[in-house]
Amino acid sequence: MEKILSKVWISNGDSINQYVCIWDTGSMETIVSDKVISDLNPDKHGYVYINTIHKEKKSDKYILQLSLEGHSQSIKINPACFGKSREFDVIIGMDIIQHGLFILDKGKFSFTIDQLK
C-alpha cells in the first residue's frame, strides 16, 4: 500500500517551516521528528510515553501550530517527538483526522476540515 504523504507547515509562534507529513490512522496523536524540534526549538509542555516499533519511550511534548496543505486555518498541537527523521517529519494522527473528512480513493487522497477548536 502506498504511503499517504503531503505538506504541512509547523510554527512555534515566531518561525514557520514546511515539512513532509505522513497520514497514519493507526496513530492516536500527531507527533513530530527531532528535526522539527531542532529547527523550531518550541516550548516544552509536559511529557507522554509513546510506543514505537522498538519499545515504549518517554517523550517531551511541545506547543506548536500546524497548517495543513490546502487549508488556511492553523491547528494548535501538543505533539511528542518520535525521534530521528525519515522521509517525513510529521505523523498526522487521529487527533486531527477525526475532525475532518478523510478520503482515499484509488490512490488519490483528500482531507477537508471545517474547523478545529
Model-predicted segments: where are they?
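Pepsin/retropepsin-fold aspartyl endopeptidases
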Residues: 1-117
